Amino acid sequence: MLIEQLWTANAYRNFNYLIACPETGEALAIDPLDHRQCLATAKRNGWRITQIFNTHEHGDHTGGNEAIIAQTKGKLLAHHKARDKIRGIDEGLAAGDTVKVGNGVALKVLDTPGHTMSHLCLFAPSNPPALFCGDTLFNAGAGNCHNGGDPNALYATFTQQLALLPCNTRIYPGHEYIENNLGFTLDREPDNEQAMALLAEVKSQDPNHAFVSTLALEKEINTFFRLDNPTLITKLRETFPDLPRVPDPKTVFLKLRELRNKW
């Protein structure tokens, strides 16, 4: 499996992705907002975009669909419940489905509600594994639930799906928010040495060659995976004094999401 992470350099700080089969040169475009860059990259690599995959329905992820399809005649894949939100879906996908790219790439579909209720991620059981997670999971962060989402569903997605993936899974999110998200981690957990070290590293990074984290690292630097951390809970109680002495993980997650909305 060949992966191209494409930095759009737009105000929303989007990443687009191309996944290609090395045998056939067929490629899948994920959330190809910057259709010109996606098409140019595919051409430069000698790839043919045969499928387009939308993680969810928001315009900064679907905005390049029509231009890509017009150029490639590629088939559009998205959540089976998003047909009224994304125009021109050719194949509606559900949890457990497989997206095949060429002969050698098979991606497992994960139904990951939270950011929206029709959000999908793609998991590649490659070596190492990879997760293309749209706006569900960010480096050191979690998607918001402002526009059609539900934080309760997002909690379930994190704890019942994402946290159970292999620890060496490489994380490919839909946006580049790592510096700001690490700032939130350190606001909540000021003694997190790994977050401090990584923040110093990524402050000077070129998003065209962005840092790629793993699930193991996310569990060390991402507050939304660190729901039983004593420092984090003590800090949370400063804002929410009625928090139980030993709060349940869901309560911690929801309070963190509430704080992050305003941070």
Curated annotation (Swiss-Prot):
A Pfam family this chain is assigned to: Lactamase_B
According to its UniProt record, the EC number is: 3.1.2.6
Q: Which organism is it from?
A: Nitrosococcus oceani (strain ATCC 19707 / BCRC 17464 / JCM 30415 / NCIMB 11848 / C-107)
Keyword Plastid present in the record's keywords: the answer is no
Cofactor(s) needed by this chain: Zn(2+)
In its UniProt record, a GO molecular function of this protein is: metal ion binding
Per its record, how is this protein called by name? Hydroxyacylglutathione hydrolase
- Role played: Thiolesterase that catalyzes the hydrolysis of S-D-lactoyl-glutathione to form glutathione and D-lactic acid.
Give the matching CDD domains: hydroxyacylglutathione_hydrolase_MBL-fold
What residues bind Zn(2+) 1, as annotated? 56, 58, 115, 135
Pathway given for this chain reads: Secondary metabolite metabolism; methylglyoxal degradation; (R)-lactate from methylglyoxal: step 2/2
